[in-house]
Amino acid sequence: MVKQSSSNMGKFLFLLIIFIAVGQMTQTMYVPAIPEMATFFGVRAASLQAVMAAYLIPYGLSQFVYGPLSDRIGRRPVMISGMVIFLIGTVIALVAPSFDVLLLASFIQGMGTGTSGAMSRTVTRDCYDGDDLHKVNSLVSMGVIFSPLIAPVLGGYLSEHLGWESIYIFLLGFGALVTLALMRSFGETLPVENRRAERVWVSYRYVLSNRRFQGYVVCLIATFAGVATFEASAGVLLGSVLKLDPSTVSWLFIVPLPGYLLGSWGSNKLMKRLGTNRVLFLGMFALLTGAITIIIPGMEGLVTVTSLIGGAFIYFIGAGVLFPAATTLAIQPFPHHAGTAGAVLGGLQNLGAGLATLAASAMSAQSQFNLGAVLSVMAIIVVLSLVWIRRSEKHDITILAS
């Protein structure tokens, strides 16, 4: 384990947060520009939800390659290579002559930033364990929330004053700066002597055979799928249904995100006081409450800012509680397979979110009920996954006692 000193922790966290921020900003920065982009490419506004799906699916799938590869050759070269792929995709998006080319560019972008999804979980496990690991994961979760806060507001400002293309110009510049920062200042967290050359399928079988890991993976997939579906749908509901201007959409879009920050902060504080099971229950309860808040007005055919944004705020609190807690508990048992475990977590989580947003894009984008229904289903899946985890723990205790 390459333990980070307290003096280096700040730099380590800063570099990790801006590295993750590239992928997160790319996911949501275009949302306020959806009406303008739809007009430019001659497609329905609802079709722009496919941009997020085209981004998230390779973002998830690529992590299955990045994780085991990083266990073999180290974290740093994988991180830098992924950023280069992202920059190529961003250039293509900037000059895309058609909607199909934009989708291809989003696919390449997601394939590149998938490295941040895998490595964000892996490098923290390289350097920390136990309570320190949960603390660092919570700090990272709180830190990275500022990029989704900034992205829609900045995207709305840029698209309103400079056109939607300026969003991709910004992403290109920001991505280039982060790549240079990683090349210059980010040290390798996996020493040569700790690297593993075993076959990929052996690593995956070892990680996936853990019953509790299976439960936490499902929990994270469902939680993030709900978040991503809201991000893909809210812009259409606020901009195309309620006819709000891009600036207003961008500000409303970020209102739920402090809920995630609050949940992440609470997850770290409450874990020591209440214990794992109670913290996970609180997160699950918040997800259910937020989903119900959104679906009830939708059942009456209504789309209201209060229920949509208020329900999402509560849902995001639950997500903020669950993400650092479930990630830490899932990856904790795998100090020598951190890359593979991180890849499975990030890969399946984002693949599931991509498929959920793809399914949402096929539904009516004019209905708040559809969004509430998806969030409700995701919350129920989280409940079932936590039940699975509890039963697995009892099963393991029974085996040890026999």
Task: Describe these PLM feature segments.
Residues 61-100:
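Conserved MFS/SLC helix-loop-helix module at the cytosolic interface between two early adjacent transmembrane helices
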Residues 327-365, 369, 374-375:
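A late C-terminal transmembrane helix in Major Facilitator Superfamily
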Residues 85-92, 100-108, 306-312:
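Paired small-residue
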